[in-house]
């Protein structure tokens, strides 16, 4: 019973960290990475679909994307979606191919991105702590129903605390790594 609660908590904590990594991948550093454009949705005949489902996205060099729509009609729609995506990108259309240069990050924009990254990391830490709280309340419930002893509950709570500390340290490491990549000139 205790192991099941601990495994469930650890699994949920893993998902929180994976979600944080996903959120960080969508925040651009100074290099072109296709995940930056994956969050853009395009109006495809009345329904919103991810850009990757209507065009081929590739990285031409460290500062340029190349987008090749699969249909000629989609060029203008994709261009509009990229410009309104609030990523500060301006596509240059040449026939059916779009090249999207990444503008250099200003110091002000870097500061804004660091704040966003810090907020994401803080939300992940809160999620980890909430998972710990849920597990501890499950242990207390088992103690109340006399299914485990006080010592067993205390050991389980200490074990969950160690797991929580490990995940919090991992989140802090990911935050520092992302912050350094954003502040790198």
Swiss-Prot record:
Q: What GO MF terms are annotated? A: ribosomal large subunit binding
- Name the family: Belongs to the RRF family.
Keywords (alphabetical) are: Cytoplasm, Protein biosynthesis
Protein function: Responsible for the release of ribosomes from messenger RNA at the termination of protein biosynthesis. May increase the efficiency of translation by recycling ribosomes from one round of translation to another.
Q: Which SUPFAM superfamilies match?
A: Ribosome recycling factor, RRF
A Gene Ontology biological process in which this protein takes part is: cytoplasmic translational termination
Which domain of life does the UniProt lineage start with? Bacteria
Compartments in which it is found: Cytoplasm
Q: Name one GO cellular component term.
A: cytosol
> In the UniProt record, does the keyword Transferase occur?
no
Q: Which InterPro entries match?
A: Ribosome_recyc_fac (IPR002661), Ribosome_recyc_fac_dom (IPR023584), RRF_sf (IPR036191)
Gene3D superfamilies attached here? Answer: 3.30.1360.40, Ribosome-recycling factor
Q: What protein name applies here? A: Ribosome-recycling factor
HAMAP family reported for this sequence: RRF
Could you tell me the gene encoding this protein?
A: frr
Query: What is the source species?
Result: Ruthia magnifica subsp. Calyptogena magnifica
